[in-house]
C-alpha cells in the first residue's frame, strides 16, 4: 500500500523504520509488521518496534552469539591462559583459507564464472567456504547474482538504499519478504560438488571450521607438554569463532562500506565504490566500482599497483594447470569507461565553476576570477580527453587495435584530467 492510498483509507502513513530505511521494500509487507500505530484519531505518535515476527532467529542467534563470544570470550581466554604462536598462526592460516575460498571460489569462480577451475580448487573453496558460515555456495551465488542484476533497487538482497545497517547485516537478521526462488543458478545446480556442499554445508562448517581448530589446539598443547584442554579451547575461540566473525564482517563491509565510501572512477550509474583499504582487508575485493562495471573479469584490481591477491592466485593456478579460461576485459574498454566518467564529472565541474558570480569586492572577486580560470583550464583538458574518447570508441566499434604507446598517452591524459578535477575543488 502506498502512502497516498493509505491516507485515502484513513490510515496514518508510517514513519521511517527504527534502524534501516525501507523506502520501497516496505510496500510489500503489512505496515503492522513493522510499526505499532496509536488508536485511530489519537494524537499519539507511532511507536517503532522491532518486527519480531520477521526476525531470522537462527541466523540472528548465530551472528550475534559468535560476535559476543569473540568480543568477550577471546579476551578472557587470552587474559587467563595467554596466546602462543601456534594459535596466531592457525588463526591467520584459517582466515586466509576462508577468505580466499569466498573471494576466489564463491565469488569469482561460482557467482561470476570469471574462470574455470579443476576439481581440487573447487573442493578446497567449497570446504573452506563453508567454514565462513555464509551459507552454501549455491545460496551465496544466487543472492550475489540478484545483487548485480538489481543493484540499488528493491530486489537487491543487500540494497544500500535501505541503509548501511541493512546492507551490512540487517538483510540477514530480518526476512521482510518471501525468499525468492533460486532460479538464477541453473548452471551451478548441474555441478555435483556444489550440490553436495549445499546439502552438507553446515556440517562441513562445524567440523572443519570449529571442531578441527579445537582438535589441532588440543594436539599441539599435548605435544608441547601443556594443558591440552587449554589448547582446544584456544583453537575453538581464536581460529574458530573469532576467525568466523572477522571473515564474515570483511565480506559484509563489501556490501555496505564499498557502496558508501570511496571513489567511482568507472561509473556512477550504481553506488559501488573503489576502496584500497577494503581491498587490503578483503583479498582484493575492495575495487568494487570496477567490479560492478565489469563483473565477469577475474580481476578486481586491474592497475599494477592495486592489491588483489585473489587475482594473483587465480593467475598462478592457471600457470600450474588448475585454472583456465580466465576472462578479462580489454584495456581499451576499461580506459573508455574511465574517460567517460572523467568527462562527465569534468563537464559538471566546469558548469559549477562558471556559475560562480563575479563580485566587485576584493577577495570575493579574486576567488571568482580564479574559479573561472580553473574552469577554462579544465575545459582545455577535457576537450583533449573528449577527442581521445571518440577515437577510442570508434576503434572499439571497428575492432581496430591501438598501439600501447597511444593507449599509454591517453591513460596519462585521462589521469591528468582526474587530477585537475581534484585540484579544482580548491575553488568555489
Predicted segments, located by residue:
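Pore-loop/selectivity-filter region of tetrameric P-loop cation channels
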Residues: 99, 104, 278-292
Amino acid at each position: 500500500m502506498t502512502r497516498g492510498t493509505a491516507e485515502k483509507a484513513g490510515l496514518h502513513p508510517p514513519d521511517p523504520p527504527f534502524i534501516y530505511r525501507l523506502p520501497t521494500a516496505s510496500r510489500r509487507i503489512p505496515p503492522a509488521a513493522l510499526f505499532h500505530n496509536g488508536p485511530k484519531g489519537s494524537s499519539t505518535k507511532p511507536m517503532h518496534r522491532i518486527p519480531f515476527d520477521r526476525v531470522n532467529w537462527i541466523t540472528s542467534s548465530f551472528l550475534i552469539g559468535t560476535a559476543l563470544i569473540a568480543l568477550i570470550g577471546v579476551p578472557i581466554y587470552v587474559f587467563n591462559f595467554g596466546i602462543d604462536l601456534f594459535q596466531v598462526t592457525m588463526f591467520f592460516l584459517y582466515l586466509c583459507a576462508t577468505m580466499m575460498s569466498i573471494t576466489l571460489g564463491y565469488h569469482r569462480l561460482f557467482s561470476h564464472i570469471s574462470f574455470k577451475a579443476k576439481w581440487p580448487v573447487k573442493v578446497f573453496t567449497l570446504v573452506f567456504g563453508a567454514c565462513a558460515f555464509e551459507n552454501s555456495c549455491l545460496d551465496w551465488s544466487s543472492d550475489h547474482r540478484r545483487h548485480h542484476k538489481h543493484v540499488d533497487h528493491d530486489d537487491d538482497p543487500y540494497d544500500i538504499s535501505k541503509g548501511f545497517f541493512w546492507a551490512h547485516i540487517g538483510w540477514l537478521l530480518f526476512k521482510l519478504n518471501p525468499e525468492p526462488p533460486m532460479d538464477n543458478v541453473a548452471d551451478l545446480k548441474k555441478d555435483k560438488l556444489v550440490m553436495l556442499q549445499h546439502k552438507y554445508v553446515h556440517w562441513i562448517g562445524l567440523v572443519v571450521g570449529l571442531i578441527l581448530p579445537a582438535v589441532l589446539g588440543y594436539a599441539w598443547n599435548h605435544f608441547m607438554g601443556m594443558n591440552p584442554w587449554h589448547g582446544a579451547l584456544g583453537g575453538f575461540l581464536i581460529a574458530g569463532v573469532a576467525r568466523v566473525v572477522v571473515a564474515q564482517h570483511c565480506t559484509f563491509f563489501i556490501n555496505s562500506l564499498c557502496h558508501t565510501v570511496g571513489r567511482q572512477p568507472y561509473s556512477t550509474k550504481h553506488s559501488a565504490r573503489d576502496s584500497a583499504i577494503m581491498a587490503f582487508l578483503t583479498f582484493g575485493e575492495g575495487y568494487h566500482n570496477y567490479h560492478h562495471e565489469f563483473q565477469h573479469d577475474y580481476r578486481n584490481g586491474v592497475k599494477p599497483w592495486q592489491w588483489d591477491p585473489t587475482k594473483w592466485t587465480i593467475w598462478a593456478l592457471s600457470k600450474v594447470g588448475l585454472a583456465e579460461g580466465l576472462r578479462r576485459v580489454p584495456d581499451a574498454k576499461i580506459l573508455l569507461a574511465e574517460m567517460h566518467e572523467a568527462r562527465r564529472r569534468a563537464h559538471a565541474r566546469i558548469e559549477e565553476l562558471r556559475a560562480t558570480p563575479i563580485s566587485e569586492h576584493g577577495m570575493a572577486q579574486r576567488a571568482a576570477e580564479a574559479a573561472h580560470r580553473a574552469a577554462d583550464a579544465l575545459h582545455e583538458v577535457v576537450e583533449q580527453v573528449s577527442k581521445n574518447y571518440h577515437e577510442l570508441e570508434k576503434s572499439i566499434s571497428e575492432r581496430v587495435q591501438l598501439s600501447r604507446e597511444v593507449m599509454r598517452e591517453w591513460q596519462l591524459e585521462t589521469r591528468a584530467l582526474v587530477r585537475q578535477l581534484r585540484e579544482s575543488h580548491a575553488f568555489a
